């Protein structure tokens, strides 16, 4: 029987077109195009965040359902973007808990949904239970989440360069914040920085070398680190730089 115009319209209205589904029918993962947001966010703006008064108040079990008694987050990917490198950390270090910290709401929503989808897809193995994403402003609230000497590694990959001189104070690496990072890093802990902007790289190196609690790894030490090869294109931003044949500027620092 041929559908009349009214019947065809009803059928069309009752159908949910796949194009409106934010989850891919093929991979089961969220589709990035439904979570697009401007590339950067003003970290000084008065965003509305719920944050704990102290690290002991953080409900880590809500983010890591399989967390063990006494287990703590060891790695922090600050400004994790769409979570590509965070996922890599979860795969490389299955016994460690890694957190991605992202200020942009849609982007952090994407990472949360991505992690949830990966957990569902790997329910039989329990993979990706060791990664999570938190929407927050790391420039303001880092000590609210981590206790003294808790973190083993921190990552600052392709941060906002804030090109204008008046906005340099917004850069994620500056003297005041370096002291906070030193507080939450254990002695011997590592800070990984990567950018495709040479001016920002020089800024990072200068500020970290001037700080008394950090020393830069030698080129040999950096190249021997198994994480180093992953820094170039595990993140979405890094992969874009590779596609565009851009430059990468790497510097890794040890907490003294």
From Swiss-Prot:
One term under GO cellular component: tRNA (m7G46) methyltransferase complex
Name assigned to this protein: tRNA (guanine-N(7)-)-methyltransferase
Keyword terms, alphabetized: Methyltransferase, Nucleus, RNA-binding, S-adenosyl-L-methionine, Transferase, tRNA processing, tRNA-binding
Residues at the catalytic site: 160
Organism domain of life: Eukaryota
One GO MF term: tRNA (guanine(46)-N7)-methyltransferase activity
Region annotation (Disordered) ranges: 1-25
Keyword NAD assigned: no
E.C. number: 2.1.1.33
Keyword match Repeat: no
Xref: InterPro entries: SAM-dependent_MTases_sf, Trm8_euk, tRNA_(Gua-N-7)_MeTrfase_Trmb
PROSITE patterns membership: SAM_MT_TRMB (PS51625)
Residues given in the record as S-adenosyl-L-methionine binding sites: 79, 102-103, 137-138, 157, 235-237
Reaction catalysed by this enzyme: guanosine(46) in tRNA + S-adenosyl-L-methionine = N(7)-methylguanosine(46) in tRNA + S-adenosyl-L-homocysteine
Pathway participation: tRNA modification; N(7)-methylguanine-tRNA biosynthesis
Compartment list: Nucleus
Family label: Belongs to the class I-like SAM-binding methyltransferase superfamily. TrmB family.
Pfam families associated with the record: Methyltransf_4
């Amino acid at each position: 029987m041929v559908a009349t115009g009214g019947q065809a319209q009803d059928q069309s209205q009752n159908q949910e077109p796949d194009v409106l589904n934010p989850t891919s029918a093929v991979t089961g993962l969220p589709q990035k195009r439904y979570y697009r947001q401007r590339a950067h966010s003003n970290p000084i703006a008065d965003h509305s965040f719920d944050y704990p008064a102290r690290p002991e108040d953080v409900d880590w079990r809500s983010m890591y359902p399989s967390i063990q008694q006494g287990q703590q987050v060891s790695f922090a990917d600050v400004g994790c973007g769409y979570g590509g490198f965070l996922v890599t950390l979860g795969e490389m270090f299955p016994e460690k808990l890694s957190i991605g910290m992202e200020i942009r709401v849609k982007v952090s929503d994407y990472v949360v949904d991505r992690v949830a989808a990966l957990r569902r897809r790997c329910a039989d193995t329990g993979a990706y239970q060791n990664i999570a994403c938190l929407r927050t402003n790391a420039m303001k609230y880092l000590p609210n989440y981590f206790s003294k000497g808790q973190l083993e590694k921190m990552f600052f990959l392709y941060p906002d360069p804030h090109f204008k001189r008046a906005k340099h104070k917004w850069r994620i690496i500056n003297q005041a914040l370096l002291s906070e990072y030193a507080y939450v890093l254990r002695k011997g802990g590592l800070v990984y920085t990567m950018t495709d902007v040479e001016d920002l790289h020089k800024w990072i190196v200068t500020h970290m070398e001037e700080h008394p609690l950090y020393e830069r790894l030698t080129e040999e030490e950096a190249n021997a680190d198994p994480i180093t090869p992953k820094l170039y294109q595990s993140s979405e931003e890094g992969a874009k730089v590779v596609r565009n044949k851009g430059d990468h500027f790497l510097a890794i620092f040890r907490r003294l």
